[in-house]
């Protein structure tokens, strides 16, 4: 029997004081006052993009409830995320978010991963200090073997292919972890607006743009040679706008690479081949019209095995 793994299960805490206990005393005041608080500090994250009514914490904060659901549905394992946590990468400073990331990772290990071997962890790091982020990856893996992934915010000031981010990808590759870009923190904090033309006025506009941010990072990671440097590295895109936008994107990427490959002489494969080898995308169960047409589109560029649930 094949394993059924849910790659994107959202978790949180019901009481922020539980998380607060993992922060050094010097930073607790900043957390409780809301300057960087994961629930209220980013004013944009709740009233504009994520209304409280969209998801109550009760269902996301009970490990026993998740285990019961897994048994009922036949789910073998779950990769656990806190959708707010990657926003530690959206601060203007680099010290406080590093402490937030470590606090979250310790909380994840103690309150969830220790409860069941079926729980797998997606830790977070603060990419503003890549060397510190790499050290946190090593610490978290040593502390908790059920860590399988590093989550990064797709909302940044620079694309992730830039050399300054190499320590993060090196650490992930050395420890056998996937790297995940999970949509949801674009335009939060000090990062760029969530669209290339600035700020949208409503959630409708925002919800149709995550693919553009993911594609920008993906183009940078491929062109700058990250997957050449780390041939075993895997990148996941979760809630980033689906796989179908990649079809026309990869056609154009391959086309331009053939004409401009002298700018990236370290690449020995077409971008589409690199994507098929290194990239996986999450999807949700949803009505897709005619499944036969859908799967023909996936097969058209060899993506029929790129989807995660």
Model-derived features with residue positions:
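Helix-coil boundary/capping segments in enzymes
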Residues: 1-309
